[in-house]
From Swiss-Prot:
UniProt source species: Hyphomonas neptunium (strain ATCC 15444)
Highest taxon listed in the record's lineage: Bacteria
Gene Ontology MF terms in the entry: DNA binding; DNA-directed RNA polymerase activity
Catalytic activity: RNA(n) + a ribonucleoside 5'-triphosphate = RNA(n+1) + diphosphate
GO cellular component, one term: DNA-directed RNA polymerase complex
Transmembrane segments: none
The EC number(s) this enzyme carries: 2.7.7.6
A Gene Ontology BP annotation from the UniProt entry: DNA-templated transcription
Reported function: Promotes RNA polymerase assembly. Latches the N- and C-terminal regions of the beta' subunit thereby facilitating its interaction with the beta and alpha subunits.
Protein name: DNA-directed RNA polymerase subunit omega
HAMAP family, per database record: RNApol_bact_RpoZ
Protein family according to the UniProt entry: Belongs to the RNA polymerase subunit omega family.
Length: 116
C-alpha cells in the first residue's frame, strides 16, 4: 500500500480547498460505481481518490465538471417552465400609458377613495 500525502496532491491541485472538494467528489464517484484507474490495494475510497489525483491517472477536469453539475440545483423541467413563462410574458397584453391614465381618471371620477 503506497502512502499518499497532501504534498503529492498539492503539486497537481495547488489549492487545498479545491483538492478536498475534488477528492471527496471522486470518492463519491467511486462509491457509486465509477471504475478505478489504479489498484485499490485495500484502501478506502477517499485514499484511492487521493492516490488517483497524485498519480494523475484521472482527468481532473472531468471530476470538476461532475462536481459542478452535481452542485447545481436544477429541477427536471425547470428550463421548460422558464421558457413557458417568457412566452407568456411576451404574449400578455401590455397596458399603454394612455390606458393607465384613463383607468386612473375613471377611478378619480368615481369618487372612490380606498385610502384610510
Amino acid at each position: 500500500m503506497a502512502r499518499v500525502t497532501v504534498e503529492d496532491c498539492i503539486q497537481k491541485v495547488p489549492n487545498r480547498f479545491e483538492l478536498v472538494l475534488l477528492a471527496a467528489h471522486r470518492a463519491r464517484m467511486i462509491r457509486e460505481g465509477s471504475p478505478l484507474t489504479i489498484d485499490r490495494d485495500n484502501d478506502k475510497d477517499p485514499v484511492v481518490s487521493l492516490r488517483e489525483i497524485a498519480e494523475t491517472s484521472i482527468d481532473l477536469k472531468v471530476v470538476k465538471e461532475a462536481l459542478i453539475s452535481n452542485l447545481q440545483d436544477i429541477r427536471p423541467g425547470e428550463e421548460n417552465e422558464r421558457e413557458a413563462d417568457r412566452v407568456a410574458l411576451q404574449a400578455a397584453p401590455a397596458a399603454t400609458e394612455d390606458d393607465v391614465l384613463r383607468a386612473y381618471q375613471a377611478e378619480l371620477e368615481s369618487g372612490r377613495d380606498d385610502r384610510l
